[in-house]
Amino acid sequence: FNPKAVSRISLDPAVVDCIVFWTKNPAPMLPRLRELERYKYYFQFTLNPYGADVENRLPDLSRRIETFKRLSDAIGRDRVIWRYDPILRDHTAKCMLGFIDHYRHIRGALGELGVGPLRRDEIEVMAQSFVRALEPYPIALETCTVKVDLRHLGIPSGMCIDRGLVERIAGYPIAAKKDKNQRQVCNSIESIDVGTYETCLNGCAYCYALKGNYNRAE
């Protein structure tokens, strides 16, 4: 998101190919999914097993897992991408794996948790554990903006705004190139980001989009 490049975005279904929602808790949206029936869309649902010391304002993990399943049952497993438990094996077709970026403004919070930069060998060990965990299940594993090449482990570099998935959901080809405004390791196609910093209430220690200003977000 670039706060210096703000514009008015039309949400007319005639000009919207697809909407991708990033969320850790879409529960409030479930009763209103019918309002989205005019649009083609899918979800990037981040679901981690961390405790309240890391993700301190989220609902209990068991509740979020149930939300994931309900969302998948409502719109289909191909349209709910799990961002980092075989427990979800029947409810998603893909898991996106990412590793923490040590942005300057979150180093203090990460330091308090004893979290430092990851070495290449540590990344590979964790990636291998995901490969083993998902091997028995029909869940594709891809990375998101990971600088370490993990293809030798069978993990390709994926994309959050996925041309193939958007085209399958929309039902027609998409005329979009790789987004040149993202990091070089990002493979996503061009899109328009609707949102802004300092608005999320989840309070995750590793979040780069909120600099601890919860009052502003509230």
Where are these regions (language model features)?
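N-terminal [4Fe-4S]-dependent radical SAM core
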Residues: 12, 154-197
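Conserved Radical SAM active-site core
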Residues: 1-55, 61, 66-70, 214-218
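Well-ordered, non-membrane alpha-helical segments in soluble/globular domains
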Residues: 58-68, 94, 119-131
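Short, well-ordered coil/turn segments that N-cap beta-strands
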Residues: 14-17, 39-41, 76-80, 92-93, ...
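Flexible glycine/acidic-rich beta-alpha junction loops that bind and position SAM and/or redox cofactors
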Residues: 55, 88-90, 95-118, 145-158
